[in-house]
Amino acid sequence: MLHIADTTLTSRLLTGTGKFATPELMLAALEASGSQLVTMAMKRVDLNGGNDAILAPLRQLGIKLLPNTSGAKTADEAIFAARLAREALGTHWLKLEIHPDVKYLLPDPIETLKAAEQLVKEGFTVLPYCGADPVLCKRLEEVGCAAVMPLGAPIGSNQGLQTRDFLRIIIEQARVPVIVDAGIGAPSQAADALEMGADAVLVNTAIAVARDPVAMARAFRLAVEAGGLARQAGLGSKQFVASATSPLTGFLHQQAEGAVR
């Protein structure tokens, strides 16, 4: 189970709604993923209700919507978008994204912390996308964020867990869920994040641009389940030297003694 604020989810796979070829393909992939929490950019939402072709089916699937502030370059812009999202979609949940750099889409730590503090005061359940900075993640936790979402690699890059060492520190120190967001490009990488101790992952590009997004969504679902189960079961410790799984010499000694007799 994944516990975020006052909500319990059975799936540890969060998904996005961007880059799919058609809305129908997106909905089919999201259903195959088993995801119960899906993020959507506010800039894609028709505030006049014209986007119900997407929103209504999502709600019918029992999927909780997590609007995000992608496109915001400052704390003020993100706060404005958050207020619009709450009014338009009737949710106080928010994925906070502030990335002024259009080439690498790296999150602005100063503006993110500033916006998070204000939005928490306004009653939002804030899940901030941030760099894999243990100090920043702890500060975001301290101002009241419901989870932290450190990046594995730049958004859409499919590079995997490039920030592995820092993610380990964040996971060790966090008292809120850690959701690895951005850069995960293969189901094996998602499983790796869960085995490492992450509470969940968010995947969009790797599913949306796959040759078969529905099959890829199912692959990620199985990988996340496997990674989480492996972590729960207890992974064996790594060793430099070999450790035999059965006695190496007992059988030979028994045979030698039998031959002498």
From Swiss-Prot:
It comes from Pectobacterium carotovorum subsp. carotovorum (strain PC1). Transmembrane segments: none annotated. The keyword Transferase applies. The active site is at residue 95. Homotetramer. Forms heterodimers with either ThiH or ThiS. GO terms for cellular component: cytoplasm. Keywords: Cytoplasm, Schiff base, Thiamine biosynthesis, Transferase. This is Thiazole synthase. 1-deoxy-D-xylulose 5-phosphate binds at residues 156, 182-183, 204-205. SUPFAM superfamilies: ThiG-like. Its EC number is 2.8.1.10. It is found in: Cytoplasm. The gene is thiG. GO terms for biological process: thiamine diphosphate biosynthetic process. InterPro entries: Aldolase_TIM, Thiazole_synthase_ThiG, ThiG.
